[in-house]
């Protein structure tokens, strides 16, 4: 099938690769504009999807706006039968959604209608979900509200981070996408409307989510740490006299009567901190200001922490 692909980050690369490998004619790729990088912001970094497209000699288009008619004109010239969107990062206007004869479909990294929005993987982990998945849906005017074509679920590991789940779902989504496209091409795709009563949202993440509140349970904080990777990263200024970023934690399963925020142990295994409801969280990887990410044990060699210090 003649397909126009729209995507930007690493998550979308397996989907593009899968379409090419399946023998579809990818007539073009839309990706967000290159971003300036470097100390002086004087170098342009192409998106992962752009790099993938160029490696396959696929024409790349990077419109700044989607509503000024330029993007639509480019699409009409390319004349795709279907548009496939995977983490493009732009909202498509109705005239683009209705342009290809077989419509537009999207690879969404949640089990819709749960977690509509920009950060579904992160919120699934932050909220302590044990199952996630991907959805292939027909795109509609309302964000992430279109009919479901296919879904596949996967368990979230107890210590799996959002960053790790992101990589797994990108592969799962690519495989499911190829199946869905084949069904659409054969006229066999089933469309299931979303249940509006089950909708939950996954808004963009912000730095305001980073601070750790030690009155919460160890499990809730463990989910926060895992869910805020790779950005904005959980942090605390209550333990060491400086704000540290927390990258890896463990639920010890221990119990304590100490006040939340109390450092119970600091050594080779990490930093054990009292949390809400008498639970204990162990910090095993962190980053101090101006330093690289490191094991908590390595940090402690140069920054000893007094055990039983209070919040």
Region annotations inferred by a language model:
Residues 1-40:
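N-terminal Rossmann-like dinucleotide-binding module
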Residues 7, 29, 53, 83, ...:
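A residue-level signal for conserved active-site and pocket-lining positions in enzyme catalytic cores
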Residues 8-11, 64-67, 88-90, 252:
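Short beta->alpha connector loops
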Residues 22-25, 82-201, 208:
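Donor/substrate-binding cores of folate-linked one-carbon enzymes
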Residues 36-79:
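N-terminal glycine-/serine-/threonine-rich beta1-alpha1-beta2 phosphate-ribose binding loop
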Residues 203-216:
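Acyl-group handling in specialized metabolite and lipid biosynthesis
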Residues 215-311:
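An anion-binding loop in the catalytic cleft
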